[in-house]
Amino acid sequence: MINISEKAISARTATATGRIHLRRSTIQAIREKKVKKGDVLEVSRVVGTQHAKNTFLQIPYCHNIPIEGVDVDFNVGEDYVEVSCTLTTTYKTGIEMEAISCVSGALINIWDMVKYLEKDESGNYPETRIDGIHVVEKRKTPV
């Protein structure tokens, strides 16, 4: 792990985003809150937050940093759900890996909650895919 003891503390923010592509009927079930496992977006918000908080446990060279804020937002389109996670900290190292982890966790959870609606006759997922996970913005401000 990189030694950050000599680095200055800075206010840091990172935003990441990604999408899951789903059948239109699945999107309708999400909007109408008719998914068997519960409210997909609210559960995914919690899962994303948990993933952000546990990034250092999943990625061995990430530092355990003090997360001061997590905002998980959803944009539900006609055939996709876009997840956007913005995280903040005041620390010696960036928070972009936590933002990516937040997005990834939320997207994976969406898939888990709706997979029964997405499977075809053979049990596969021909229309379901997660893509576009990336850091949209990273800011660092001296304190």
UniProtKB/Swiss-Prot annotation:
GO terms for molecular function: cyclic pyranopterin monophosphate synthase activity. Signal peptide: none annotated. It catalyses: (8S)-3',8-cyclo-7,8-dihydroguanosine 5'-triphosphate = cyclic pyranopterin phosphate + diphosphate. Its EC number is 4.6.1.17. Belongs to the MoaC family. Homohexamer; trimer of dimers. One of its GO terms (biological process) is Mo-molybdopterin cofactor biosynthetic process. Catalyzes the conversion of (8S)-3',8-cyclo-7,8-dihydroguanosine 5'-triphosphate to cyclic pyranopterin monophosphate (cPMP). The keyword Oxidoreductase does not apply. The active site is at D112. Gene3D superfamilies: Molybdopterin cofactor biosynthesis C (MoaC) domain. It is an enzyme of class 4 (lyase). Pathway: Cofactor biosynthesis; molybdopterin biosynthesis. It comes from Thermoplasma acidophilum (strain ATCC 25905 / DSM 1728 / JCM 9062 / NBRC 15155 / AMRC-C165). Keywords: Lyase, Molybdenum cofactor biosynthesis. This is Probable cyclic pyranopterin monophosphate synthase. Substrate binds at Y61, C62, H63, M97, E98.
